[in-house]
Amino acid sequence: MQDDGGTKMNDIKLKHILPQTGEIVVGCMRFDSLTPEQIADMIDRLAGEGILHYDHADIYGNGICEEKFGQALQLCQTPREQLILQSKCGIREGYYDLSREYILDAVDRILARLQTGYLDLLILHRPDALMEPSEIAAAFDELQAAGKVRYFGVSNFTPGQIELLESAVHQPLLVNQLQLSIPNSWMMSSGLETNMPTEGSIDRDGHVLDSMQAKGITIQTWSPLQFGDWEGTFLDHPEFPELNRLLEKLAEKYGVSKSAIAAAWILRHPAGMQVVTGSSKTERILDMAKARNLHLTRKEWYALYQAAGHRIP
């Protein structure tokens, strides 16, 4: 890869298995506000730009997001086989449940709502303190044998939890969804501030970034424009004046929006990550997708990191 000023993007390991995927994954959490007709139009427009990967979860809109998407699949011109559909399960009201019975039932319900015979990826939404790897392995085997799920992954799992799961399951875990944005980049701070008596040096996730990169598990980044604990977007937020000034400067330089620069910052990392969008508006998704053609310089990447308030020892 070119060190500075180039346009070559990093290798996304998931693309070796699912060739239709790319740097952008369309998050469907807010699709309950759309009509099936609007979603169908979005699917076709994004397909024309090479964006074919959609992220669902059974809890999004209490299932309404998947239901409307399933209706849209019957209306759009893009064949189901061209799309990558992934969904997540395991979060119930007030507790987590990764039991065999719940996983199997959740997938059946997801498939019914999406009006499809299979998921390209099933992702375990969050770790369950009571999870038994042998139960999960049995569920995975049944789902794959029945043709209901092609591949599997996790979300918000530590390397240790992945190792525990891998001790029983027979399928490779292809993805780990993790929160990452320029301000919310603790997984990078702990590595950069190693051996320092600083807040940023604290390892909160078992060095998940290094581990996923070493294992070839693709990180899908959620909330790429958010900061704090669901406090909102950092774009144009008064708490981040220096960051927004630099984003504006780089946006002008590259002829894109600030959101595209924020996504390009994530895509610049050699781990080969994917950005999960959070918008229900086609234009905003296409706008962020311009990050696919950007390659920030090393100096620009570190400048954005520091502008968000992070420390370089």
Indicate residue ranges for each PLM-predicted region:
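Structural motif corresponding to the early beta-alpha repeats
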Residues: 76-101, 125-126
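A structural motif
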Residues: 51, 116-119, 149, 173
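Beta/alpha (TIM)-barrel catalytic core signal, keyed to glycine-rich beta->alpha loops juxtaposed to Asp/Glu
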Residues: 131-313
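N-terminal binding-site loop/beta-alpha segment at the start of enzyme catalytic domains
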Residues: 2-83, 145, 217, 226-228
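Acidic-and-aromatic substrate-binding clefts and catalytic sites of carbohydrate-active enzymes
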Residues: 31-37, 57-67, 92-97, 127-132, ...
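Hydrophobic faces of well-ordered beta-strands that scaffold small-molecule active sites
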Residues: 22-27, 54-56, 83-87, 122-124, ...
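Active-site groove signature of glycoside hydrolases
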Residues: 111-132
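Short, acidic/polar
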Residues: 34-46, 98-114, 160-163
